[in-house]
A protein has these predicted regions:
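Alpha-helical transmembrane segments of multi-pass membrane proteins predominantly involved
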Residues: 1-172
Length: 172
C-alpha cells in the first residue's frame, strides 16, 4: 500500500507541474478516488489480519473463497489502483495525463504511463493471490455496517468510473 501512495503522489505532482485551474479539479478527483480505494483496501486488510492473524499479503490468498464481498472489493480496489478502465482509478490518471500532454509535458505523461504499467504487475499479483484457493484460512465475517461501508465505497469507484463527468462537475 505504501508504494501505491507513492505512485499516486507522482500523478498529483504531474498535475501540479501543469498548474492550470482545470487541473486542480482533476487532482481533487484523483485524491478522492485514491482515498476511497485506499480506505476500503486498508479496511479489508485490517479485517483479514484481525480475523486470521496473518499480517502479510499472503493473508489475502483465497480471500475470494472465504468472503466473496471482501474478495471482489479488494480486486476492484487493486484494479482501480492499477488504472484499469472503467474504474475511477483509470480516469483519475487519464485526466491528469491528458492535461500534461495538452501543456507539452508529454515525456512526463509517458513516464506516468510506464510507472502505471509496472505498478499494475504488483496489483495483478495480489489479485491472483486473492483468487487462489486456500483452505487453511477461516471464513471471514463482517458486520452489517462494515458490509455497507465496503459496498458504498465500491459503488463509488465503479459509478465514478462509469460516469466521471458527474463527479468532476460536482467538484467544480
Amino acid at each position: 500500500m505504501a508504494y501505491t501512495g507513492i505512485a499516486n503522489a507522482g500523478f498529483v505532482l504531474i498535475a501540479y507541474l501543469v498548474l492550470q485551474h482545470e487541473t486542480y479539479v482533476y487532482v481533487i478527483y484523483n485524491l478522492t478516488v485514491y482515498s476511497v480505494a485506499a480506505i476500503i483496501a486498508l479496511s479489508i486488510y485490517s479485517t483479514v489480519k484481525t480475523q486470521t492473524n496473518i499480517d502479510t499479503i499472503s493473508g489475502m490468498t483465497g480471500l475470494l473463497t472465504h468472503n466473496k464481498l471482501l474478495g471482489v472489493a479488494m480486486i476492484i480496489c487493486m484494479l482501480s489502483f492499477a488504472g484499469i478502465p472503467p474504474l475511477a482509478g483509470f480516469f483519475a490518471k487519464y485526466f491528469i495525463l491528458v492535461e500534461a500532454i495538452k501543456y507539452d509535458y508529454t515525456w512526463i505523461a509517458v513516464v506516468g504511463v510506464l510507472v502505471s504499467v509496472l505498478a499494475a504487475y504488483n496489483y495483478l499479483r495480489i489479485i491472483a493471490s486473492i483468487g487462489q484457493r486456500d483452505d487453511t484460512i477461516p471464513t471471514i465475517s463482517l458486520s452489517l455496517i462494515h458490509r455497507a461501508f465496503i459496498i458504498a465505497g465500491i459503488v463509488f469507484l465503479v459509478v465514478s468510473g462509469l460516469m466521471p463527468e458527474v463527479v468532476i462537475s460536482w467538484l467544480r
